[in-house]
Amino acid sequence: MTDAGKTARLNRISTDDRLLTIPMDHGITLGAIDGLVDIEATIREVTANGADAVLTQPGIAPRVHPNKGDAGYIVHLNASTTLGPDQTDKRRTGTVEDAVRAGADAVSFHINVGSDHEPDQITALADVAADADRLGVPVLAMAYARGPGVDEHDAANLGHAVRLAEEVGADVIKTAYSGSTESFQRVVDATAKPVIIAGGDPAGDRETLQGIRDAMDAGAAGVSTGRTVFQHATPGAMTAAISAVVHDDADPEAALARAGLVVDA
């Protein structure tokens, strides 16, 4: 029964085994930044233009459902702030049961492999995965290589992080992009679970799309990108361009043209 539920919920956030999700959980971390003040308008724009799912903290759920259309909804269950002493120290913000009551199709949880808080985060992710499995809810693990002396984009480190996430019970794994198709293939090969890349800091449109294209060519299952989209001058158009790369195998130039965006250098 739980496997059927998990499959059904996975199909609500991705219907072709590829995933474009727009995380909007930055309010805890950074405050009400541009693009998230009127989060309802942003949700409407991105979901109308190809986002498969949006992601927020549980308390934002009432602002999500009236505006997301048919898109899926992922609830994130831990956080830290830029005002705190250690951003790698992610603390629980809810339970799987809270997420289900909030109408989630999946839950997500962040772990920093290599940080001082890694042991506690492994335990917490395992607990979330066990609770989610019991309820038939998919788990998206945000598994990063972060900590003192840790190279956040090293393929071996990222491969370790995604394999850890699989072994603890994640169904989909988000991690940083290693910077090249060849190196990211090693990350993807480290796990049997779908791997999606984080968007990272905003860059030029073509550069962003080329990175996603390269990751997809390496075997990535999609992308989870927030500020690149919701702080874009036209979030809907940027969502459409990314969707073309993820779901239609478009190259950056074709994706930009399809979305009506100017091809930058």
From Swiss-Prot:
GO MF term list: acyltransferase activity, transferring groups other than amino-acyl groups; fructose-bisphosphate aldolase activity; hydro-lyase activity; transketolase or transaldolase activity
Enzyme class: transferase
Keywords: Amino-acid biosynthesis, Aromatic amino acid biosynthesis, Schiff base, Transferase
Active site: 25, 144, 174
Reactions listed under catalytic activity: 1-deoxy-D-threo-hexo-2,5-diulose 6-phosphate + L-aspartate 4-semialdehyde = 2,3-dioxopropyl phosphate + 2-amino-2,3,7-trideoxy-D-lyxo-hept-6-ulosonate
Span of the signal peptide: none
Family matches, as SUPFAM superfamilies: Aldolase
Gene Ontology biological process terms, A to Z: amino acid biosynthetic process; aromatic amino acid family biosynthetic process
Pfam families: DeoC
Annotated positions binding 1-deoxy-D-threo-hexo-2,5-diulose 6-phosphate: 25-29, 144-146, 199-200, 226-227
Enzyme nomenclature, EC number: 2.2.1.10
Alphabetized InterPro entries for the sequence: ADH_synthase, Aldolase_TIM, DeoC/FbaB/LacD_aldolase, DeoC/FbaB_aldolase, FbaB-like
Family membership: Belongs to the DeoC/FbaB aldolase family. ADHS subfamily.
Function: Catalyzes a transaldol reaction between 6-deoxy-5-ketofructose 1-phosphate (DKFP) and L-aspartate semialdehyde (ASA) with an elimination of hydroxypyruvaldehyde phosphate to yield 2-amino-3,7-dideoxy-D-threo-hept-6-ulosonate (ADH). Plays a key role in an alternative pathway of the biosynthesis of 3-dehydroquinate (DHQ), which is involved in the canonical pathway for the biosynthesis of aromatic amino acids.
Quaternary state and interactors: Homodecamer.
Name of the protein in question: 2-amino-3,7-dideoxy-D-threo-hept-6-ulosonate synthase
Organism, scientific name: Halobacterium salinarum (strain ATCC 700922 / JCM 11081 / NRC-1)
Gene for this chain: aroA'
